[in-house]
Amino acid sequence: QVLTPMRKGLLGVERLNSILQEYLNPPEPGKAEKEYGDHKFRVGDKVMQIKNNYQLEWEITTKYGLTVDKGMGIFNGDMGIVTEINTYTETLEVEYDEKRKVKYPFELLEELELAYAITIHKSQGSEYPAVVIPLLSGPRQLFHRNLLYTAITRARKCVTIVGNDQTFQEMIRNTNEHNRNTSLAERIREFGKDPKACLAFYKGKALSQWTEPTAESLL
């Protein structure tokens, strides 16, 4: 999962999602897609619900289409995969965790956005097998140690930090928010001495070597 500090800019969520979508889920003959505002959704896209909607119905079905469970409510931060776009019924189907499927009327697509990249703030409370953190310069009030801490601790196995080493060092030093009693600062400071290194964690322990993740493992 790509986690970035900002929505706008060269490495912001909006630009990264556009680039990653074209690389990871490019258009193909026969692959359904739907444009809505500034977004373009395709079957196979990773998407995220961006507001609570207690009225959305979900259901879990067997491969034969029999409903085995159903309920109400999809919430801010829920992630899923676009599984169907039906221009006849004007609906887009997303499959969330536990095989919950939701059909969105096209007029509700404003509640979805691509989720190949999300902001670090939006990732709070979630975990991913592997995390990629792109860093360029940014406002000091945003680029601080706690933000870096939040991003790194979202990963269960591997963290890759790419970009500007000076920005990385400045974020370590910037305690703009309340200090945490943690050894993370020392750990990432040691990592920062080698700008060509890749920082990886497995079960909370820093690794000296790691296997480069596949594109699938980063999603």
Give the residues covered by each predicted segment.
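C-terminal accessory regions
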Residues: N76-L219
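Conserved helicase/translocase motor-coupling segment
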Residues: Q1-I74
